[in-house]
């Protein structure tokens, strides 16, 4: 699994011009799922998302607090393109997990993130 983590003051996901999910202060996380990812990868990436220190701690220390420390929101977006390979001028996604397998895997990831954090603070691209 790959997670691209971005600290945000607000973020949203729009589909056909309509906002389907949004957050205030927190993290926007793009999630890529590789063909051979397993449950242990989910636990690892959840731990990293929750504990990586990307916020000021309030005492003047930069990079001193995690999203869990601050009780901020998390917006997750499934992004299979994180596992692309550039072949000449063409993108190849053979390393990404196929859609029929990745959808339940992604839902399991969201369930684990909600279980380890505050469920109502975890949003996804379908909320």
Predicted feature locations:
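Short glycine-enriched, charge-decorated loop/helix-capping segments at active-site entrances
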Residues: 91-96
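A short acidic, glycine-rich active-site loop
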Residues: 98-104
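N-terminal, polar/charged subdomain of small-to-medium soluble alpha/beta proteins
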Residues: 1-90, 104-127
